[in-house]
């Protein structure tokens, strides 16, 4: 408990995201009484905090009662026409075709009527309080169906025989395999890698030379580290409705891919460029 007041004494002015606020305040008060925090140091911390708030004009906002804008004002700003237009422009200009197998794109129901859709996500690792219940992969699946594709969602077969599906059976059933990865990093999960399903990584992309295969990342732009041999790969950087609409326009050939990758999507691996 000495570490709490010691942190303030060492120059930390404020604690954020405490586990138990009342407990930490108790430690702070005890530290002040014990002399760990001097009156001068306490005054300095309070002055800095108040100065920061004043520089942001929070005292004026409090006096005017404008901390939270009226609903009418908020509705005139959130999702206003200008913001929607900017979002559409950003989506159209950012989606990146990292690499492609000649002849695979564009995707049309006439060319690939039967699509095996393989969603990858980490929602089972625990939902974030900042995300809604809509799955980005589900949004993409519905968009494919709306375009006229017959979409089958991949389900790993039960038992050991699941890893032994004949290649002939796959080629007879599907014209295209489309992977969609919605694997977002979080504050407590800064590295995200693909975890393949049982039995024995049954959803690993092993048909890339047999069935046209497209891999779409809706979040993390570094998935080629795990799927280097996928020959058509797209980074979207997000999976909201605006991005999915722009993606479908590009997949079907209604709009070109113009995005330039802001990072090295090949992760420094030569084999990912093949």
Regions picked out by a protein language model, each given a short descriptive name:
Residues 1-274:
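Preference for extracellular/luminal or secreted protein segments
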